[in-house]
């Protein structure tokens, strides 16, 4: 399924994360565990086109996503995977038709994608009037943990105002978060 994603992201300190967690009373909220496996081919074609290919395992579902970065919004091609698909594969010799079609539409030729990173995120969400507030605690492959605030919205202009207000109200300096895959690659070099 093709979706448009409009989100704003900010890295947090552990204390800022804890403060927001308490302020929005997330202690008793559902905790979503995301296990993300990121893939690229030998020529780094996904990175080259500003895209990421991942398989995400959560408490409720498994899906493959092709995420294509845009200036103010991202495009996501999400394909549910069932138990017939290999669990935590290190290579993806066969991609779902929806993802192949999007790559062909973009005129991108991909070799067999190989596993490049694996991360795990503990996620809490709360719906606010202006959008969805998401707090992520992410553990990367070398046991580095970071904290992130995401704010997902349906409208860019409304979202940017609400996100900046959220940061200001909570005395959080702007510290834009790179995508998790980019942070994973950076952390792997430490």
Feature-to-residue mapping (PLM):
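Phosphate-end processing signature that detects enzymes handling 5′-triphosphorylated RNA
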Residues: 1-190
């Amino acid at each position: 399924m093709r979706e448009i994603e409009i989100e704003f992201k900010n890295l947090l300190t552990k204390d800022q994360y804890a403060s927001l967690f308490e302020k929005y009373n997330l202690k008793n909220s559902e905790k979503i565990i995301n296990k993300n496996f990121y893939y690229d081919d030998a020529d780094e074609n996904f990175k080259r086109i500003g895209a990421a290919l991942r398989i995400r395992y959560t408490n409720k579902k498994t899906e493959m996503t092709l995420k294509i970065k845009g200036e103010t919004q991202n495009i996501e091609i999400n394909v549910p995977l069932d138990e017939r698909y290999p669990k935590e594969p290190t290579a993806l010799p066969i991609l779902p038709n929806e993802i192949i079609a999007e790559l062909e539409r973009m005129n991108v030729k991909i070799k067999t994608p190989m596993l490049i990173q694996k991360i795990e995120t503990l996620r809490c969400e709360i719906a606010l009037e202006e959008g969805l507030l998401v707090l992520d605690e992410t553990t990367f492959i070398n046991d580095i943990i970071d904290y992130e605030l995401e704010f997902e919205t349906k409208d860019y202009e409304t979202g940017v105002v609400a996100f900046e207000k959220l940061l200001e109200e909570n005395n959080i300096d702007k510290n834009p978060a790179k995508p998790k895959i980019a942070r994973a690659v950076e952390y792997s070099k430490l």
